[in-house]
């Protein structure tokens, strides 16, 4: 998994060097978050990054990680689809729109919070 996110990995290490801070990255398969408690996998993390991606694989696991970050005041950084998922998590769990969804997902919903631009 590390090689798939090499550019993010390097960017975080460069930032930590500039901030004179130690960095330890823990890679977590989002599908594991669908099968296990987010607390079990994320406890002890000082920040959570959900990168971009495609498809529905691990989708709800990523939402669980984002919810865990919000509820436990852990800094969160969502990139592309990761940011869209943060919007969905907030819509579902704070605004009570339980079926909030993005059109990028194959799941049907009456409440698409994020749509696809016509030019895409």
Question: Residue locations for each model-derived region?
Answer:
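N-terminal beta1-alpha1 cap of cysteine-dependent amidohydrolase-like domains
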Residues: 1-120
